[in-house]
Regions:
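Bacterial N-terminal signal peptides that target proteins for export
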Residues: 1-8
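Cyclophilin-like peptidyl-prolyl cis-trans isomerases
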Residues: 19-274
Length: 274
């Protein structure tokens, strides 16, 4: 009787131990491979190893939010999804449910880039969300939704700026603009040649979709103690020859805009490329 009770007790212990949902071994991660790391978008990161579990803890210090493991994850490969909210280097830390660190990896998110295809050529802009997060997020939301397609460069002034993003053929204001954003002009960036800034009215917090590219250094547009200034949020990486070509076009008056190119210059598309 004693031996049978002992056998039954051991069997019960083994049964309880087997119901824990894991293998009982410490998980190990031997490789981390990001498939996509684009600012503002969902990232997919593959974690390879052994005895991996979908209840492990993910820490990114806010650089990649709402982490979750995809249903196709296995004990050999976890598929991590999260939303990228910062640029630059960040540390991805994976812990067990008990808080034991399994792996730390340094990952890098590049600054976002937007490609603008125009009737005169292509322009690539690099944006700076660290300096102007509200402005960059606003611009990307317009670009990624296709808002800028078929809008005009409606204000062209050689030696000053080229401006776009709010009107279609005939200087008709494009519908679908979002609420105005907070002005981020006091961010350390300067209105130098080739930089990109938001256009606005005389009211500081009034920018929506319109933006301009500085054709020359326009330091008087910067923030100062006496001027609200205009928020720079990026710069032209490629295509300053296109900017110069647009700025060189002859202009005239239409619907109150005295600097409208006589030859219509259209943005055919604008989209995030990085």
């Amino acid at each position: 009787m004693f031996h049978s009770k002992l056998f039954l007790s051991l069997a019960l212990v083994l049964f309880i131990a087997g119901c824990g949902g894991g293998t009982g071994f410490q998980p190990t991660i031997t490789g981390v491979k990001p498939e996509t790391l684009q600012y503002g978008k969902s990232a997919t990161i593959y974690l390879g190893g052994k005895d991996l579990r979908s209840n492990m803890i993910v820490e990114t210090n806010g650089a990649c939010t709402n982490p979750s493991f995809a249903s196709k994850s296995t004990t050999d490969t976890l598929v991590l999804n999260c939303t990228v909210k910062a640029v630059g280097d960040f540390t991805l830390t994976i812990k067990t449910e008990a808080g034991v660190v399994v792996n730390t990896t340094s990952l890098t998110v590049p600054k976002p880039q937007v490609g603008i295809l125009t009737s005169l050529g292509s322009i690539v802009m690099e944006l700076d969300p660290a300096a102007a997060p509200i402005t960059v997020n606003n611009f990307l939301s317009y670009a990624n939704s296709g808002f800028y397609s078929n809008t005009l460069f409606h204000r062209v002034m050689s030696g000053f700026v080229i401006q776009a993003g709010g009107y279609t053929t005939g200087m008709v204001k494009k519908e679908g603009q979002k609420d105005p954003i907070v002005l981020e002009s006091n961010n350390g960036l300067s209105n130098l040649r080739g930089t990109v800034a938001m256009a606005r009215t005389n009211v500081p917090d009034s920018a929506t979709s319109e933006f301009f590219i500085n054709h020359v250094d326009n330091l008087f547009l910067n923030y100062s103690t006496t001027s609200a200034g205009y928020a720079v949020f990026g710069k032209v990486l490629q295509g300053m020859d296109v900017v110069d070509a647009i700025a060189a076009k002859a202009t005239g008056m239409l619907n109150g805009e005295k600097s409208l190119p006589l030859e219509e210059i259209t943005i055919t598309s604008a989209f995030q490329v990085k």
